[in-house]
Amino acid sequence: MKNLLLALLLVFLTGCIKKLDTDGLTLKIDESELNKSSKEFPMKKNFVFANIQLEKPYIFIKDGTNRINAKIDISLSTVFMPSSFGTFALSGKPYFDKEKKAIFLEDVNIEELEFSNLDLSKNFTNMIMSNMKPVIDNIFTNIPIYEIDKSSFKGSFVKDVKIENSELLVTFGL
C-alpha cells in the first residue's frame, strides 16, 4: 500500500514539475487549473444605455504567444437594438501578486468581438470594444486566473511567472 501511494505521488508530481535547477522548482499550471469555476461569474454590468452579462471565461494559451488568452460569452441588451449574444476574445500577460498570492492578467487587449445575431459596422464594434476595455481591465486586475492556497507558504516563494512553449510556468525559489 505504501509503495502504491508513493508511485501515485511520483506520477502526480512528475506531471506538474517542469524542471528543478538553480533557479528553483518550476511547475506547469494546466489549462484545467486556469479554468476552475469562479464564483464571480456570470457577471452583470449595467450602463446608461446598455446592460451586459459576461459568462465564465474559457482560458487558454495560444501557440506561439507569450500571452494568456480568454474567450468570454457575452449578452448585450441596449435601448436601440435587440438583445444580442456573442463572444469576445482577449489576451493578457500573466503576473504574480505576492500579497494576494494569485496570478492576474495585465496589458489586456480585446482581440475580437462577434455577435451571432447582429451585423455591426467596424466603427460600432470598435466603440463597444473601447467602452468595454475598462470593464475588462477591472475584471482581470481583481479576479485572478490562478490562486495559490492562502494557507500555503508557497505564495511567499514565487520567483517568476512566464509563458514558455505555450505553457504557464511558475518558478518557486528563495
Residue ranges and their predicted role:
Residues M1:
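Tryptophan-rich substrate-binding surfaces of secreted polymer-degrading and adhesive proteins
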Residues L4-L13:
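Sec-dependent N-terminal signal peptides
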Residues C16-L174:
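Extracellular/lumenal and peripheral-membrane lipid-interaction modules
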